[in-house]
């Protein structure tokens, strides 16, 4: 399994498109495993799996900031940022929250968010801060 060897999005950079498709399949399986055994949100996570793999392949998180519209889309992101075990191993599922959380991973989770409609304001704030600080990262 590829997903067990992914500690950060940088690990995706060397994979082929075919291998990235396998990663997406493994992520979807991990989401279903977690939700079946622990509860959580299925649709938003499954629906955004390929997009999350693509975002992490193209951009350079954590330098580039990725903001999700709803935290219910964050399971694939969590799996690609070193937290796959919380989706694959039933004994580790309590270690992962159902939402993005800087307490869980301050490097990749910029905000503690839950529901929708905060993403535009959060991304705008990150952009403004980047511009004030003279940064070059993508938001």
Task: Please report, for each region that a protein language model flagged, where it lies by residue.
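A short, mixed-charge helix-start or loop-turn motif at secondary-structure junctions
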Residues: 13, 37, 107-108
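Asp/Glu-centered strand-loop micro-motifs enriched in Gly/Pro and often flanked by an aromatic residue
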Residues: 33-42
């Amino acid at each position: 399994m590829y997903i067990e060897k992914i500690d950060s999005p940088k690990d995706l950079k060397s994979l082929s498109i075919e291998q990235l498709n396998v990663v997406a399949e493994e992520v979807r399986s991990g989401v279903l495993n977690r939700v079946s055994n622990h509860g959580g949100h299925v649709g938003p996570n499954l629906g955004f799996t390929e997009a999350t793999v693509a975002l992490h392949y193209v951009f350079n998180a954590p330098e580039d900031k990725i903001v999700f519209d709803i935290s219910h889309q964050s399971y694939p992101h969590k799996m690609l940022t070193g937290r796959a075990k919380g989706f694959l191993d039933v004994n580790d599922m309590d270690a992962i929250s159902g939402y993005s959380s800087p307490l869980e991973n301050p490097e990749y989770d910029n905000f503690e968010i839950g529901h929708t409609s905060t993403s535009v304001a959060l991304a705008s704030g990150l952009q403004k801060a980047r511009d004030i600080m003279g940064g070059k990262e993508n938001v």
